[in-house]
Amino acid sequence: DTDRSRGLGDVYKRQVLHEPEIPANTGNIGRTCVATGTKLHLIEPLGFSLSEKHLKRAGMDYWKDLDVTVYENWEDFCKRNPGAKIYYATTKGRHVYSDVHYEPDCFIMFGKESAGIPEEILKANPDTCVRIPMIGETRSLNLSNSVAIVLYEALRQNDFDHMKLEGQLHRLSWDD
């Protein structure tokens, strides 16, 4: 079966952006979320307005289909998601992102472009801090690229269980 599309119900992978600053990154992440059936959670303050044209342009015509929730702050997020399993993607993490198991209902959180996730949050959750390996003194990867890397690993671990696995040619057939 190459089409695993089905209703996702109330839970599946959730991407959390903690105080994102750049609308184009958030727009690109929104498009990735739509393409993967993933919910997007935004923790304020945001460095832009959700109505900004750059945000919509990066998300293209997919933005209207995005399942997005906005929180007033970190405390609001925690209050509205009690007991949530959260993985914190950070350059400071001690675990490689591909070495952990992502549950279907987990959250994967990414920090703002200029500073990442606050260290107080990371220190309180050392076992669920994950990092993408890099060489040398590279500070970090682009936020939208990081989200895609970690999200697709989480989806792979769960057998892409709600995704279409095979594409079709537009003018020709693979079988000709």
At which residue positions do the language-model features occur?
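Short internal beta-strands
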Residues: 39-45
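Amphipathic alpha-helical repeat scaffolds
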Residues: 21-28, 141-145
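Hydrophobic/aromatic ligand-binding patch that stacks against planar heteroaromatic rings
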Residues: 32, 121
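Short, structured coil segments at secondary-structure junctions
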Residues: 7, 36, 82, 124-126
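S-adenosyl-L-methionine/SAH cofactor-binding core of RNA-modifying enzymes
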Residues: 52-119
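Single conserved hydrophobic/aromatic residue that forms the stacking wall/gate
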Residues: 1-12
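Structured adenosyl-cofactor binding patch, chiefly the S-adenosyl-L-methionine
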Residues: 124-175
